[in-house]
Swiss-Prot record:
PANTHER family: ARSENICAL PUMP-DRIVING ATPASE ARSENITE-TRANSLOCATING ATPASE (PTHR10803), ATPASE GET3 (PTHR10803:SF3)
Chain segments annotated as coiled-coil in the UniProt record: none
Species of origin: Neosartorya fischeri (strain ATCC 1020 / DSM 3700 / CBS 544.65 / FGSC A1164 / JCM 1740 / NRRL 181 / WB 181) (Aspergillus fischerianus)
Single GO MF annotation: protein folding chaperone
The protein, known as: ATPase get3
Compartments (UniProt record): Cytoplasm; Endoplasmic reticulum
Catalytic residues, chain numbering: 63
Cellular-component GO terms for this entry: GET complex
KW Zinc-finger (keyword) present: no
CDD domains, per the entry: ArsA
Residues annotated as binding Zn(2+): 283, 286
EC class (word): hydrolase
Length: 340
C-alpha cells in the first residue's frame, strides 16, 4: 500500500481512465466493487469508451443479477451479441455459479462441444463434484474457452459484488483437487467402473473414465493459462468502483489488498455518486452529505496517491440506455467539472 504523504502539483495521477484506454496490450479488464455503487454503469461506460479505440470489445456480466440488459435496454444471454448501435461492442450475461449439470446435460446433443459426453452415473457425478467449488470452476473454464475462441481484442468483466469477485483465482487449485480425486478413483475402480458402465452402454458419447479425466484436465489447463494472463499487468487490470462512504472505502481497501496478494494489477478507482452542492446552497442534507463525502474522498486520495482516482457526480436520473451511458462514459476520460 502506498504511503500517505501529501502529493503536490505535477505528481498527481490523472483523475481519468485514459491510461486504460491508451494501454493497447490490455486484454482483460475487471470492474468490481460492493453492490449498489454503480459497477455496471461504470463497466458499460468503460466498454463504450474502449469500443472507440479498440477493434472489438466484449462485455461480460458474471453477476447473477444481470444488469447489462437493464443498462442497455436490450436482452443479453449466454451467447455474445452486438449491442444495438455498435459494430464492435458485444455483450453477454453468464452465471458462473450456475450448476455444471446444464453443461453435462448437453453432452449427447452437442458432439463438438468441449464438454460433450461428460455425463456419468449419479455416483461418479457425486464423487467428481463433491469438492467445493468444482462446478463453478468448470462453468468458468467453459466460459473462458468460449471467450478465447471468440477472439475479442479486449474483454471487460462486470463482476459479482465483492466476495465472489476473486473466486476465479482459486479455480485452478480447485480443479487440480478434483482431478487428483478422480485420478485416484480411476486407478482404484477404473477397470471395474468401465466394465459396469460398458455393460450398460458406457458414458454418453461412448467414453470412459480416462476420457472424462482428459476433459477436466483440458479445462484446468485453460483456467491455468488464463490465470497467468490475469497476473500479467500488461494484459490485465482491475478497476475498483466505490462511493465515498465508510463501508465502501473499507471494502475497496480489502479488495485492493486481496488483488495485490494475488499479483493482479490495479491502479484505478472510480468514486461514484458524489454531490456537488452549489455555493451558498440552502440544502442542509446536501451540504452535510457533501461534508461526509469530502472526508472519505480525501482519505481515498491520500491512501491511493499512485492510483487514477476518477470522481463521478450523482446524477438526477438513472443512467440507462445508450445515450445516457455515452454521456456518462465521457466523464471517465474528461473529468467532471461541477457548475459554479
Amino acid at each position: 500500500m502506498s504511503s500517505t504523504a501529501v502529493v503536490h502539483g505535477d505528481d498527481l495521477m490523472e483523475p481519468t481512465l485514459q491510461s486504460i484506454l491508451s494501454q493497447k496490450t490490455l486484454r482483460w479488464i475487471f470492474v468490481g466493487g460492493k453492490g449498489g455503487v454503480g459497477k455496471t454503469t461504470t463497466s458499460c461506460s468503460l466498454a463504450i469508451q474502449l469500443a472507440k479505440v479498440r477493434k472489438s470489445v466484449l462485455l461480460i456480466s458474471t453477476d447473477p443479477a444481470h444488469n447489462l440488459s437493464d443498462a442497455f435496454g436490450q436482452k443479453f444471454g449466454k451467447e455474445a451479441r452486438l449491442v444495438d448501435g455498435y459494430s464492435n461492442l458485444s455483450a453477454m450475461e453468464i452465471d458462473p455459479n450456475g450448476s455444471i449439470q446444464d453443461l453435462l446435460a448437453s453432452g449427447e446433443s452437442q458432439g463438438d462441444d468441449p464438454m460433450a459426453g461428460l455425463g456419468m452415473g449419479n455416483m461418479m457425478q457425486d464423487l467428481a463434484f463433491s469438492i467445493p467449488g468444482v462446478d463453478e470452476a468448470m462453468s468458468f473454464a467453459e466460459v473462458l474457452k468460449q471467450v478465447k475462441s471468440l477472439s475479442y481484442e479486449v474483454i471487460v468483466f462486470d463482476t459479482a459484488p465483492t466476495g465472489h469477485t476473486l473466486r476465479f483465482l482459486q479455480f485452478p487449485t480447485v480443479l487440480e483437487k478434483a482431478l487428483a480425486k478422480l485420478s485416484q478413483l480411476s486407478s482404484q475402480f477404473g477397470p471395474m467402473l468401465n466394465s459396469i458402465l460398458g455393460a450398460r452402454g458406457g458414458l454418453p458419447g461412448g467414453q470412459n473414465i480416462d476420457e472424462l479425466l482428459q476433459k477436466m484436465e483440458s479445462l484446468r489447463e485453460t483456467i491455468s493459462e488464463v490465470n497467468t494472463q490475469f497476473k500479467n499487468p500488461d494484459m490485465t487490470t482491475f478497476v475498483c468502483v466505490c462511493i465515498a462512504e465508510f463501508l465502501s472505502l473499507y471494502e475497496t481497501e480489502r479488495m485492493i489488498q486481496e488483488l495485490t496478494s494475488y499479483g493482479i494489477d490495479t491502479h484505478a478507482i472510480v468514486v461514484n455518486q458524489l454531490l456537488f452542492p452549489k455555493e451558498g446552497s440552502g440544502c442542509e442534507q446536501c451540504n452535510a452529505r457533501r461534508k461526509m463525502q469530502k472526508k472519505y474522498l480525501e482519505q481515498i486520495e491520500e491512501l491511493y496517491e499512485d492510483f487514477n482516482v476518477v470522481r463521478m457526480p450523482l446524477l438526477v436520473e438513472e443512467v440507462r440506455g445508450k445515450e445516457k451511458l455515452e454521456k456518462f462514459s465521457e466523464m471517465l476520460v474528461h473529468p467532471y467539472v461541477p457548475p459554479q
